[in-house]
Swiss-Prot record:
GO cellular component: host cell membrane; membrane
Residue stretches spanning the membrane: 10-30, 35-55
Localization of this protein: Host membrane
Keyword field: Host membrane, Membrane, Transmembrane, Transmembrane helix
Membrane topology: Multi-pass membrane protein
Electron transport as UniProt keyword: no
Organism this protein belongs to: Human cytomegalovirus (strain Merlin) (HHV-5)
Name the record gives this protein: Protein UL148C
């Protein structure tokens, strides 16, 4: 079952997959330079978004673990 503590791990695994795919795209781009660079740029943006999401999720989980020792932005104060 997915609990809030598992979300950062899942996001980090997704980020790892993205970076591995980017490495493969670089290898393809060396041989075929047409579409691989556009795909590489797209994967770079997706990878960075996943990394930022994982960092935000991990910060939120740490905050819950420390019983809100620092404030969390919420929609309804």
């Amino acid at each position: 079952m997915l609990t809030p503590a598992v979300f950062p791990a899942v996001l980090y695994l997704l980020a790892l997959v993205v970076w591995v795919e980017m490495f493969c795209l670089v290898a393809v781009a060396v041989v075929e330079r047409e579409i691989a660079w556009a795909l590489l740029l797209r994967m770079l943006v997706v990878g960075l978004m996943v990394e930022v999401g994982a960092a935000a999720a991990w910060t939120f989980v740490r905050c819950l673990a420390y019983q809100r020792s620092f404030p969390v932005l919420t929609a309804f104060p």
